[in-house]
Amino acid sequence: DVRDIEKKLRGETFIESFSVKKIYPNTLKIIIVEKTPIAILQNKKKKYFISNKGDLINYKDVEAYKDLPIVFGGGEDFYSLYKELKNIKFPLEMIKSFYFFESGRWDLIMYDEKVIKLPIDDYIFSLKNFLLSKDNSNFKNYKIFDYRIKDQLILN
């Protein structure tokens, strides 16, 4: 029954949209558009994917998505950070994980083990500053870029 199929498809969080058409006498044409995961949210003991539109998708072990960055906490705040990162053309493929703190700020852990400690406010300025300095030879040996104190960069 077409309604049963539609009900099952609606319950699947990976599906963005779908259409089901009955072609008589005995054929169904089903078109499914999947959501696109951008990160894995680790929320306490549960895992979800976060889609490119900010939706939560029930986690499944999918080979194609195993290397997505992991978000620890702050799932509802992550999407706005993600959009800002895209807007400033931050190289998202460099980010291994995101850590959200209850104070309302983020740490970004990069694949090269560099850590960017962002302030609560005006973190776009800090991210742009990191983009300008990350390839500078004077900054190569530093692993921690701490922007938490306004108008200061603490390197470690």
Describe each model-derived feature in a short phrase:
Residues 2-156:
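Charged, solvent-exposed interaction patches on well-folded alpha/beta domains
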